[in-house]
Amino acid sequence: MASATRLIQRLRNWASGQDLQAKLQLRYQEISKRTQPPPKLPVGPSHKLSNNYYCTRDGRRESVPPSIIMSSQKALVSGKPAESSAVAATEKKAVTPAPPIKRWELSSDQPYL
């Protein structure tokens, strides 16, 4: 491998303010160390470093269907008929978006209409 002459090396070292030839042999000095400190993970489902399988880290497995806190429907007890089910069925009417249409009556003075 070609290298600069001694005069050029000293001139280059003086201009840069440091010894550049000493750095050539240790050119990989900025590489990280072989032994790394253990990572500092936040506490959560994945904070364990071992025995941490993917299926236990998966957030989709932690989701559950919504739980019913309150319902407006009454659950029937087995063996008993519904209380006042006939009354409730007669009170309900069909929901219409407008008032009911008036029935047209034919005029009695013009029977052909």
Swiss-Prot record:
<comment type="similarity">
    <text>Belongs to the complex I NDUFA7 subunit family.</text>
</comment>
<feature type="region of interest" description="Disordered">
    <location>
        <begin position="31"/>
        <end position="52"/>
    </location>
</feature>
<dbReference type="GO" id="GO:0006120">
    <property type="term" value="P:mitochondrial electron transport, NADH to ubiquinone"/>
</dbReference>
<keyword id="KW-0813">Transport</keyword>
<dbReference type="InterPro" id="IPR009947">
    <property type="entry name" value="NDUA7"/>
</dbReference>
<keyword id="KW-0007">Acetylation</keyword>
<comment type="function">
    <text>Accessory subunit of the mitochondrial membrane respiratory chain NADH dehydrogenase (Complex I), that is believed not to be involved in catalysis. Complex I functions in the transfer of electrons from NADH to the respiratory chain. The immediate electron acceptor for the enzyme is believed to be ubiquinone.</text>
</comment>
<feature type="modified residue" description="N6-acetyllysine">
    <location>
        <position position="40"/>
    </location>
</feature>
<feature type="modified residue" description="N-acetylalanine">
    <location>
        <position position="2"/>
    </location>
</feature>
<dbReference type="GO" id="GO:0045271">
    <property type="term" value="C:respiratory chain complex I"/>
</dbReference>
<feature type="region of interest" description="Disordered">
    <location>
        <begin position="86"/>
        <end position="113"/>
    </location>
</feature>
<dbReference type="GO" id="GO:0005743">
    <property type="term" value="C:mitochondrial inner membrane"/>
</dbReference>
<protein>
    <recommendedName>
        <fullName>NADH dehydrogenase [ubiquinone] 1 alpha subcomplex subunit 7</fullName>
    </recommendedName>
</protein>
<feature type="modified residue" description="Phosphothreonine">
    <location>
        <position position="96"/>
    </location>
</feature>
<dbReference type="Pfam" id="PF07347">
    <property type="entry name" value="CI-B14_5a"/>
</dbReference>
<keyword id="KW-0597">Phosphoprotein</keyword>
<keyword id="KW-0496">Mitochondrion</keyword>
<keyword id="KW-0679">Respiratory chain</keyword>
<keyword id="KW-0472">Membrane</keyword>
<comment type="subunit">
    <text>Complex I is composed of 45 different subunits.</text>
</comment>
<keyword id="KW-0249">Electron transport</keyword>
<keyword id="KW-0999">Mitochondrion inner membrane</keyword>
